């Protein structure tokens, strides 16, 4: 076996790579190019479109198969946009990979997790995620948390010979380990993927839209087949029956709606990437827009993650020199690499050459660290930690409380003549001094918190620090209700009411953070947890949405939906706005698509009963669908629209599309009756039908585009001009008769009445719904 201070040689690594003994990593956020092609091409609706187009071509009606071109354009746009987005997101994801340290040829080298090979010797420190199954060779107080694997949040000490599993993360101490399993034989493939996905999330938008698709999938073929049969039986012409069925079925298909929703989410991810916010879960964009409680970790979120040593308060009987020597001795003995240790080493240094008999590294659950050091006259133990945890049975020192009220982070330095054992505090502890450190509030935090509060988002601060200190800093950052603080180390039992009544929660253990999030969710809130430390991971996993900082721990980044690549918390505003833009715009776009779906379904059902040809043929509706749905939907999906979304997503869609669809049905039945009474030709009737459908669609488009800015005004003008040109210049190609005839007496009154009729039907539906809800409550 190789010595662990040397690790593997270059030749040994080469042989293992050749043998495939490499730590294969799970696929990231973005799908492969092949999967993008398959997802966009192999859809049920594309298959239906292709089948109908082939039948029409065989029947000698290739011009009526033009709708297939629209489907191809939609599919191509979706593929191109997703491939471009994949390239951008993959490039940014590389920056977020958590490197590991390995010994190779006697040197410490930095590797990506995918470069680890069997038998590699890795160096593990607090805050890192374990990337491969391994056995401990040497341990200096290593403690790991296996919550991602088992759901249990207790920290587990690991000693020589113990196994550490990929997907767990180190919370205290350090160790040297040898990799025992990689690739398919390791937990790494499955559990690193588990760490990277916060929850099995699905976008609410996608769930709703896929539900609509499922319903359409069940009805579109039976309705189309029945319509074909009744049309054929009524007219006896198989080509005419096929045209009617094709027109109905292509109209019922919401061409590109699900694709456009996915593309919109992906475009938002790219937009956020340009603002240095890495999206690790596309549904998270939408989820954050619906968040009504934002839970903040103090360190690295409210504060910028830097600590400054401020002062030493000596206890009676101890000198400044003794305290300085004790802190320097502790810093030399411990390998803690957190913010507190960094600030103390900068002030007191780290004594080298001391013989550390036993060390207890800091952990967020224990809230203290310590070391037993051999000195003349026997061993001495030094403890450094939160006063309330170092002296749990005593009243808080008055000086400590005073410092906490001033916003300082306070540590208690204590000594004992008893050797430390198994991470338990000695009984003869004596307080030597209080050490005061200060956090720096982020310069952009007050404005960011003010923005969220103005948007109706409640802010909660959840921290492991003293509640008085946290309360002071929260107030300084402008968080309302910061004075309502609670010490969670004294709290047991149900948190349902406690979590609603308070703003600041101090002395919170990692498991309590999770319980607070659960309580908020149990009260009906949509939650977001921000953090940068290992102790935030469990809560971030529990929350509906998690946000981590790039300079935080690897475990926190892996468990989050978003990583702020510059640790600029104001980027949260852009994430919220992107989510709102997606929800609001897709609601508008869905109304356009479902208008077509609803009226095509209603007309299909009507003409299964009526013994007349279907109101239009596919060729006539292809340009109208492109001008009123296909083209404007792409522009609408990407416009700025940052107002707070409504909770009633489906109701919001139907509020627009159902009245418009019923207006289409009314207009076409009136025109059908006029055609029968005045013996109009089918070409005349279908031309008027298509014109009136276009007017209804433009009425809806204008309504959902409000407020109409210059950009939308130009778009609507161009689309309107193209619609007019269709009837003036393109009628022959698209089988449209002239509108300049006596038929104007039929279609013009309906066109003029359309906006008013939509409003009347919409008002009736709304009042009926309100009456229904009122009677339901009674």
Language-model segments: which ranges?
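Bilayer-spanning, highly hydrophobic alpha-helical transmembrane segments
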Residues: 46-57, 208-231, 256, 590, ...
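Actuator/coupling domain of P-type ATPases
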Residues: 2-28, 75-76, 84-87, 91-94, ...
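Hydrophobic alpha-helical transmembrane segments
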Residues: 59, 63-97, 104, 201-293, ...
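Transmembrane helix-loop-helix hairpins at the membrane interface
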Residues: 23-101, 108, 154, 344
